Curated annotation (Swiss-Prot):
Name of the gene: fadE12
Function: Has acyl-CoA dehydrogenase activity on a number of substrates. N-octanoyl-CoA is the best tested, but n-lauroyl-CoA, n-palmitoyl-CoA and isovaleryl-CoA were also used.
Highest taxon of the lineage: Bacteria
Source species taxonomy: Bacteria, Bacillati, Actinomycetota, Actinomycetes, Mycobacteriales
Family as reported in the entry's similarity comment: Belongs to the acyl-CoA dehydrogenase family.
Species per Swiss-Prot/TrEMBL record: Mycobacterium tuberculosis (strain ATCC 25618 / H37Rv)
Pfam families attached to this UniProt entry: Acyl-CoA_dh_1 (PF00441), Acyl-CoA_dh_M (PF02770), Acyl-CoA_dh_N (PF02771)
UniProt keywords, alphabetically: FAD, Flavoprotein, Oxidoreductase
GO MF annotations in UniProt: acyl-CoA dehydrogenase activity; flavin adenine dinucleotide binding
Enzyme Commission code: 1.3.99.-
SUPFAM superfamilies, per database record: Acyl-CoA dehydrogenase C-terminal domain-like, Acyl-CoA dehydrogenase NM domain-like
Protein name, per record: Acyl-CoA dehydrogenase FadE12
GO BP, one annotated term: fatty acid beta-oxidation using acyl-CoA dehydrogenase
GO cellular component, one term: plasma membrane
Reported cofactor(s): FAD
């Protein structure tokens, strides 16, 4: 029997082709124009939802496509490869959609998933705090009972696209009744709830999706705002973080493909002497090396998505972290080499590559830093002792 595990099915190939064909109508110029005008990519988002791309991973009974993380990461990669990588793709359908689909009540699924799937509703995700980045055990946002209600108080930072969201999935800590200890808990908070506010963080990123500080000042929520069980929030949280890493890797792979495409088109035609500069090994070899690295990262991303969709949570966690690391490194080098290959033109607005430099660099920091990935691999894959 022929092993076809590295060959995408006809359905996946058709999806990839459909996304690439559609998103080409928008592209990098659209993305940059929206970013520089401080406007949202509303048309792109709405059409992605209408075509079924946003909810491809969500259950069919709630308006989704009934596929998996592989298909959603494929959509993300092709959008990024066209120069239109959207952070909210990582957040709304991948993290939040996954968590609610797996652990939400029937009412929560009916309320939130159809809108997430068709793009009419966007849900942000809030975990990071000023003093709690990589160490989620230091989260200080608290949720206390008041009758049947919950009262949420705390502050979050570097929250993507909150100004576009109708709700946000907040990671807080609730008090265990027997011991009094604080434990993680997940809550869906409407962004128009009294006591909920946010302010933008000025970033050196050319992106239509902005970053925000979020303040929860005694936000009152009904009992059904709690997602899943109070005593199982860690497992619920990590059910969303593996998709986050897979989607981050897919985005980085797409960015690397885009940068290489622009560079290759340039060096094929640019002449300094008698031949195109792409004929010279000083340019050809670095670009070839970048292409190899991006393709390797893509394979690891596909492996991670496949393991996740098959329910292998441990295997998916290892592969997702490796994919995120490999893709971030590959895309950063690809963007840098693209700029170098194009010389001064690589830094102009006309070619649109330099604007990706901070976005590619971001992939090495978020959603998890390269150092924390290396810690995970050292400790989990290699069995080395922890330093913290």
């Amino acid at each position: 029997m022929t092993d076809t595990s590295f060959i995408e099915s006809e359905e996946r190939q058709a999806l990839r082709k459909a996304v690439a064909s559609w998103v080409a109508n928008y592209g990098h110029e659209y993305y940059l124009d929206k970013a520089r005008k401080h406007e949202h990519t509303s048309e792109l988002w709405a059409e992605a939802g209408k075509l079924g791309f946003l909810g491809v991973n969500l259950p069919e009974e709630y308006g989704g496509g009934g596929a998996g993380m592989y298909e959603l990461s494929l959509v993300m990669e092709e959008m990024a490869a066209a120069g239109s990588a959207l952070l909210l793709m990582v957040v709304s359908p991948a993290i939040n959609g996954t968590i609610i689909a797996k652990f939400g009540t029937d009412d929560q699924k009916k309320r939130w998933l159809p809108g997430i799937a068709d793009g009419s509703l966007t849900m942000a995700f809030a975990i990071t705090e000023p003093d709690a980045g990589s160490n989620s055990h230091k989260i200080t946002t608290t949720a206390r009972r008041d009758g049947s209600d919950w009262i949420i108080k705390g502050q979050k930072v570097f929250i993507s696209g909150i100004d576009q969201a109708q709700a946000v999935l907040v990671v807080g800590r609730s008090e265990e009744a027997k011991t009094g200890k604080l434990r993680p808990a997940l809550f869906v908070v409407p962004t128009d709830a009294p006591g909920f506010s946010y302010t933008p963080i000025e970033m050196e990123l050319v992106s239509p999706e902005r970053q925000f500080q979020v303040f929860l000042d005694d936000v009152r929520l009904p009992a059904d705002a709690l997602v899943g069980a109070e005593d199982a929030a860690i497992a619920q949280l990590f059910a969303g973080l593996n998709p986050e890493r897979i989607m981050g890797a897919a985005s980085a792979v797409g960015m690397g493909r885009f940068a290489l495409g622009r560079a290759v088109d340039y060096v094929k035609t640019r002449k300094v002497w008698s031949t195109p500069i792409g004929a010279h090994q000083g340019l050809a070899h670095p670009l070839a090396q970048c292409h190899i690295e991006v393709e390797l990262a893509k394979l690891m991303t596909q492996k991670a998505a496949t393991l996740y969709d098959h329910g292998d949570d441990f295997g998916a966690a290892e592969a997702a972290n490796m994919a995120k690391y490999a893709a971030a490194e590959a895309s950063s080098r690809a963007v840098d080499q693209a700029v170098q290959s194009m010389g001064g033109n690589g830094l102009t607005k006309e070619y649109g590559v330099a604007a990706m430099m901070t976005s590619a660099r971001l992939a090495r920091i978020a959603p998890i830093s390269r150092e924390m990935v290396l810690n995970f691999v050292a400790q989990t894959s290699l069995g080395l002792p922890r330093s913290y």
